UniProtKB/Swiss-Prot annotation:
The keyword Kinase applies. Keywords: Allosteric enzyme, ATP-binding, Cytoplasm, Kinase, Nucleotide-binding, Pyrimidine biosynthesis, Transferase. One of its GO terms (molecular function) is UMP kinase activity. The lineage of its organism: Bacteria, Pseudomonadati, Campylobacterota, Epsilonproteobacteria, Campylobacterales. Allosterically activated by GTP. Inhibited by UTP. ATP binds at K10, F11, S12, G13, G53, R57, T161, Y167, D170. Residues 18-23 are annotated as: Involved in allosteric activation by GTP. Its EC number is 2.7.4.22. One of its GO terms (biological process) is 'de novo' CTP biosynthetic process. It catalyses: UMP + ATP = UDP + ADP. This is Uridylate kinase. It comes from Campylobacter concisus (strain 13826).
Length: 238
């Protein structure tokens, strides 16, 4: 019997806002839930990390000096908890079993992150959503996602974005931008390529964790990527 694949999918908070640019678009939640359900139905174990930028970004909140950076980051962590609860509701409504685990204790709302418990949930076919980042300021949710992926023994981390993958330059500004199907960790950390922050990429490199970047709004693409189908559209950093 072949080993089941285990993946961690990272969604940005901004993506949850849809066209509104702020808050949570329930139509986006419903779409993501259908994509995750397809993975579970194909015997794939799924962990999720969601950013909080649709509600508040720690760096932006601290920009004018009124709010300290540490407080801004704590606000950002709480924003990820809000998004995680919303995602849990959408996934449960689609018929899936879900657990939210927070890096910060809030027992009345969700479980506290314990790696062994998270792994057991995954083995039982439950989706696990990891909230509150790493629990520490100055670390992005990309770094938190990479850390959790390594801790749970994920085969890969998938960064689900609004574009088809990693380009050699901004495809919104340059019509001749080219999609890079594969690139190494060093290239991914270069100034002209923005995949994740350098801390997240360095962590992935040190642990040989592949980073796959794809468009979250292409139906069925997540499953195609995990199954390594030719029709899958994504970039891989390894």
């Amino acid at each position: 019997m072949s080993k089941r694949k285990r993946v961690l999918v990272k969604f940005s908070g901004e993506a949850l806002a849809g066209e509104n640019g702020f808050g949570i678009d329930t139509a986006v939640l419903k779409f993501i839930a259908s994509e995750i359900k397809e993975l579970i139905e194909n015997d794939i174990e799924v962990g999720i990390v969601i950013g909080g930028g649709n509600i508040v970004r720690g760096v932006s909140a601290a920009k004018d000096g009124i709010i300290k950076r540490t407080s801004g980051d704590h606000m950002g962590m709480l924003a990820t908890v809000i998004n995680s609860i919303a995602m849990r509701e959408a996934l449960e409504r689609s018929g899936l079993e879900v657990r939210v685990q927070s890096a910060i204790k809030m027992e009345a709302i969700c479980e506290t992150f314990i790696v062994g418990r998270a792994q057991r949930h995954l083995e039982k076919g439950r989706v696990v959503i990891f909230a509150a980042g790493t629990g520490n300021p100055f670390f992005t949710t990309d770094t938190a996602a990479t850390l959790r992926a390594i801790e749970i023994g994920s085969d890969m981390i998938i960064k689900a974005t609004k574009v088809d993958g990693v380009y050699d330059k901004d495809p919104k500004k340059f019509k001749d931008a080219k999609l890079l199907k594969s690139l190494n960790y060093e290239k991914a950390m270069s100034d002209d390529i923005k995949v994740m922050d350098d801390t997240a990429i360095a962590l992935a490199k040190d642990n040989a964790l592949p980073i796959l970047v794809c468009n979250m709004f292409k139906a069925g693409n997540l499953l195609k990527i995990i199954n390594e189908e030719e029709a899958a559209l994504y970039s891989v950093v390894k």
